[in-house]
Each structure stands twice: as structure tokens, then as C-alpha cells.
């Protein structure tokens, strides 16, 4: 029996509900000195089903650009094998950006730009905005940051936080994306209201309770 038949996973959601998951590896965190050296992207529907093969590209960097890495980043990229692949790669950043844009065009509705999704993605978005502006324009200004859910789980449901799936810490872009999708899937199962969700009446009651609680701040 398929997942859709036993109702554990809803059917693939509409094109205007997609999420674009992007993870970057850089030579550091300074937008002016450091460059993107690995780009990975996957598209999921609203139910976190991965659509298609995605993008997984190592971007060439010059020796001068690699020399900007500090000791921590140097050791991280060397131990993962990324540094050698950067030197061997002939892929330009524009080509990597083109590949992600093609992925978005294939799976997403251009009339409804998809949010960027990932883990602690503010830095990734900053590098996208600075070094891949066409990709930035193709994404919705809103973002889905799994680390925000993580922080709420830590405060509200510590057991959920401490039982989250362990990460491999590969420090490679595609592996990081898959781990982020898996983590959000875990939170959806353990943290959020089970399907089919609350009734309209329950939502109305909860909304009124929230309004009542914070009403004094609006007096």
C-alpha cells in the first residue's frame, strides 16, 4: 500500500505551495571577502515530498579566494573533500545559479514565488542576495527557517528538541538540505497538531484567547 493510500502523506501539493531548499558552502561569512563554493537545492511540495533530482554543484574558486579562508573553514572544507573539488571544478557561480533557477522554473509557479527554506538561512539568503541576485529575485521575501522551529521546541517541548534526529555534520550542501527537510518532517510529526488539524471552532476559540491575553498591550 502506498503512503497516499494509507493517508500518512497527502498527495503532492499545488505548484504555488512549493518550498525551495538551498544550502551554500562558502569560504567564510564575510560578504565582501568570501565566495560561494558549493550550491545545493531541492524543491519540496507543502508536504515535504522532494520533487525531482535537485542541484548539487561545486563552484570553482581561485587560489586567492581560497586563501581568504580562516583555519576553521580551511580544516572543515579539507576534511570533507570540498577544497580539492573546488580546485578541480570548472563550474562558475552563474552556471550554478542558472541550474537552481531552472529547477525553480520546473517545479514552482512563477506567479507565486516560493519561499526559501533551510536551517539558519539568514546567512545563505545574504550571500544569495549579494552574489546570486537573479535567484534572490525568483524567491519569495518570506523564508521558512527550521532553526526557528527548533528554538520554539527547545522552549516549549524540550523532549521534542532533545529527541530530534541526529545530524551527520558532513558540512556538505546537499546533505545539509536533506537533514533540514528531515528535521522539519520530524517537527511536523512530533510538535505540530496532527492532521486534519483543529476545527474552525477551535481555531476561533484559540484566536480569541490570544487576543484576550494580549489585549492590555493595545489599550
Swiss-Prot record:
EC number per UniProt: 3.1.15.-
Domain Exonuclease span(s) in chain numbering: 19-184
Gene Ontology CC entries for this record: cytoplasm
InterPro entries named in the record: Exonuclease_RNaseT/DNA_pol3, Oligoribonuclease, RNaseH-like_sf, RNaseH_sf
Enzyme's top EC category: hydrolase
Gene Ontology molecular function, alphabetical: 3'-5'-RNA exonuclease activity; nucleic acid binding
Location of the active site: 141
Localisation per UniProt entry: Cytoplasm
Name listed for the protein in its UniProt record: Oligoribonuclease
Amino acid at each position: 500500500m502506498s503512503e497516499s493510500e494509507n493517508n500518512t502523506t497527502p498527495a503532492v501539493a499545488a505548484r504555488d505551495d512549493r518550498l525551495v531548499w538551498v544550502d551554500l558552502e562558502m569560504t567564510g561569512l564575510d560578504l565582501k571577502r568570501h565566495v560561494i563554493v558549493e550550491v545545493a537545492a531541492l524543491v519540496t511540495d507543502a508536504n515535504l515530498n522532494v520533487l525531482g533530482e535537485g542541484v548539487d554543484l561545486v563552484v570553482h574558486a581561485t587560489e586567492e579566494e581560497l586563501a581568504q579562508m580562516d583555519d576553521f573553514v580551511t580544516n572543515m572544507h579539507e576534511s570533507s573533500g570540498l577544497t580539492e573539488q573546488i580546485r578541480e571544478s570548472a563550474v562558475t557561480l552563474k552556471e550554478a545559479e542558472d541550474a537552481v533557477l531552472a529547477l525553480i522554473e520546473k517545479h514552482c509557479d512563477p506567479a507565486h514565488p516560493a519561499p526559501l527554506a533551510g536551517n539558519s538561512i539568514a546567512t545563505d539568503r545574504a550571500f544569495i542576495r549579494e552574489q546570486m541576485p537573479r535567484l534572490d529575485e525568483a524567491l519569495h521575501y518570506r523564508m521558512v527557517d527550521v532553526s526557528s522551529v527548533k528554538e520554539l521546541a527547545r522552549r516549549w517541548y524540550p523532549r521534542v528538541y532533545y529527541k530530534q534526529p541526529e545530524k551527520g555534520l558532513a558540512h556538505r550542501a546537499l546533505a545539509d538540505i536533506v537533514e533540514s527537510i528531515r528535521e522539519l518532517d520530524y517537527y511536523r510529526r512530533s510538535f505540530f497538531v496532527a492532521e486534519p488539524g483543529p476545527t474552525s471552532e477551535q481555531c476561533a476559540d484559540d484566536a480569541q484567547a490570544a487576543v484576550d491575553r494580549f489585549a492590555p498591550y493595545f489599550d
